[in-house]
Structure formats: C-alpha cells, structure tokens
C-alpha cells in the first residue's frame, strides 16, 4: 500500500528520532523532501543531509541537531495536507512565532521559507511550520 502523505511521514520521523536523541534519521527520498531538508539546513535546524542509493531506492539521511542536550527543532507541524491544502498569497503568508520560527512554503519558484517568499513576492502552499 502506498503512503498517502510522505511529507507528514518525513516530519514524524524527524520528531520521533529527536525524542529518543538519535543523531540521524533515514527515510525514502523525493525531490520535495530534499528541498525541505535543504531549507531546514539553510535555517540551521539540522546538521546536514545526504541522499544515498540503498537496494535500488533513493534514501534521504538527515543529521539531527541538538543544543545543550535538547533538540534544536521544538515544533514541527504539518499545515497543508492531502485532505485540506492550504494556499496563501504573498501578503497572507503567516509569521511563525512572530518571526522566531519559519513556515516552509512551496512556491512556483521552489520550496523556500516564508521570509524569502515574501521578499520574492510569491505565495504558495504552506507545507509546514518549524520552530
């Protein structure tokens, strides 16, 4: 049976791995997951990520980041989902925790943070909130 929401699965794997203080987490890879991991790395929420080939399938391995024994990511919440897509225009993109967190947005110009989407002047699908 195929997975109905692979992005939610990715976020859940990251949350679960951080609860048990894992240094890294592996999952099936896709272009969108790589783009999300790239945004998380650019914003400093994860150490690094790598795509490897395992048994003919691409696998995304994310290195998790901790500060003083606590996970850097405190909140990782899926917003738009297959049953209810959430789209926002450039003026309506939400501020996460008054700018302390980021919203990851899928735009026509690629996956980016809420700040970059506002600066670029594009809206799109709000994938998740990270704080």
From Swiss-Prot:
<keyword id="KW-0699">rRNA-binding</keyword>
<comment type="similarity">
    <text>Belongs to the universal ribosomal protein uS8 family.</text>
</comment>
<dbReference type="InterPro" id="IPR035987">
    <property type="entry name" value="Ribosomal_uS8_sf"/>
</dbReference>
<dbReference type="GO" id="GO:0019843">
    <property type="term" value="F:rRNA binding"/>
</dbReference>
<protein>
    <recommendedName>
        <fullName>Small ribosomal subunit protein uS8</fullName>
    </recommendedName>
</protein>
<keyword id="KW-0694">RNA-binding</keyword>
<dbReference type="GO" id="GO:0003735">
    <property type="term" value="F:structural constituent of ribosome"/>
</dbReference>
<dbReference type="Pfam" id="PF00410">
    <property type="entry name" value="Ribosomal_S8"/>
</dbReference>
<dbReference type="GO" id="GO:1990904">
    <property type="term" value="C:ribonucleoprotein complex"/>
</dbReference>
<keyword id="KW-0687">Ribonucleoprotein</keyword>
<dbReference type="InterPro" id="IPR047863">
    <property type="entry name" value="Ribosomal_uS8_CS"/>
</dbReference>
<dbReference type="InterPro" id="IPR000630">
    <property type="entry name" value="Ribosomal_uS8"/>
</dbReference>
<comment type="function">
    <text>One of the primary rRNA binding proteins, it binds directly to 16S rRNA central domain where it helps coordinate assembly of the platform of the 30S subunit.</text>
</comment>
<dbReference type="GO" id="GO:0005840">
    <property type="term" value="C:ribosome"/>
</dbReference>
<comment type="subunit">
    <text>Part of the 30S ribosomal subunit. Contacts proteins S5 and S12.</text>
</comment>
<keyword id="KW-0689">Ribosomal protein</keyword>
<dbReference type="GO" id="GO:0006412">
    <property type="term" value="P:translation"/>
</dbReference>
